[in-house]
């Protein structure tokens, strides 16, 4: 199976305030020289943000930590992605990785986040001395090209959010731990996950001992459930293959042009691993796919392309949103 993804990025969850790392472009400049300088500064800052985020991902992987592993043991909430407490919007793309990593590093117990202004609007305040977490979004900047036509340029900006654990005077929601969830060593059919998978319309054949998506036939092959030691392993594997399944031209149309062992193949495997992690978190599955054999390839790509993780996480979020629409 060969993979060559399209490059795309998505806007992250809506926020009421931002602290941009890019310079403001509103207002008129006094001369063309100042405009050119402003553009250069914008580009430089955006480039730095890509590097800052990439460096965090590299450091985590080099320390044996996958930043896309949902921190179930911290939040006790394994059926949701990081979410803005005010808007109830899920964060997406690379922001999921940044916020999950922060939960693990700081030991936060809440999956909810707010900006400083949002906390104040809800009657709360950030506890003195607390440091926020910087996440990103894209803003479109319009300019005229050489033909005099409007051209839209995506500009990377950042803003700061705080975990609900860092905020006082806001009533925190009680997170109910579902005791009926199967443990890692138990196999139990999860009806809500089965229904979600059925709703995708994917053709899934249970036969043999390998799990794979066949693009030529547009079908998924899975071992029978009794071959898995736990339902978590089974559903995590199936979400992984379903993420591959979204490449089809009738769905998300990711281009497949490589073969096993190529950089493009490793990239698609990262997209599928991230997509499976997002779907597991959103559907209450504890499972995690182990693809450690690809880590060396991913690290090499991350060191050579600061936008690599942004592209993969964006495509994974698109797959997750396709498979589990809200």
Model-predicted segments: where are they?
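N-terminal accessory/interface modules of nucleic-acid-binding and processing proteins
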Residues: 2-326
């Amino acid at each position: 199976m060969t993979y060559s993804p399209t490059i795309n990025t998505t806007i992250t969850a809506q926020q009421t305030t931002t602290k941009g790392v890019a310079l403001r472009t509103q207002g008129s400049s006094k001369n063309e020289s100042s405009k050119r300088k402003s553009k250069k500064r914008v580009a430089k800052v955006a480039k730095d943000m890509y590097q800052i985020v990439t460096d965090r991902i590299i450091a985590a992987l080099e320390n044996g930590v996958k930043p896309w592993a949902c921190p179930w043991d911290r939040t006790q909430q394994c059926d949701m992605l990081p979410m803005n407490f005010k808007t109830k919007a899920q964060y997406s793309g690379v922001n999921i990785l940044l916020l999950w990593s922060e939960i693990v590093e700081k030991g936060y117990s809440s999956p909810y986040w707010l900006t400083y202004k949002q906390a104040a609007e809800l009657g709360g305040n950030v506890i003195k001395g607390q440091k926020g977490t910087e996440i990103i979004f894209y803003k479109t900047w319009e300019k005229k090209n050489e033909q005099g036509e409007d051209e839209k340029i995506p500009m990377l900006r950042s803003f700061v959010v705080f975990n609900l654990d860092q905020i006082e005077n806001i009533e925190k929601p009680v997170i109910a731990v579902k005791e009926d969830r199967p443990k890692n060593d138990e196999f139990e059919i999860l009806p809500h996950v089965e229904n979600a998978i059925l709703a995708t319309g994917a053709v899934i054949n249970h036969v043999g001992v390998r799990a794979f998506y066949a693009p030529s036939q547009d079908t998924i092959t899975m071992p029978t459930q009794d071959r898995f030691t736990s339902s978590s392993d089974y559903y995590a594997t199936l979400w992984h293959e379903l993420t591959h399944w979204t490449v089809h031209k009738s769905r998300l149309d990711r281009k497949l042009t490589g073969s096993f062992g190529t950089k493009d193949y490793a990239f698609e495997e990262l997209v599928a691993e991230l997509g499976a992690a997002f779907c597991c978190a959103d559907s209450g599955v504890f499972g995690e796919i182990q693809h450690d054999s690809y880590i060396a390839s991913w690290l090499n790509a991350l060191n050579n392309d600061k936008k690599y993780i942004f592209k993969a996480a964006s495509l994974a979020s698109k797959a997750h949103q396709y498979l589990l629409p809200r």
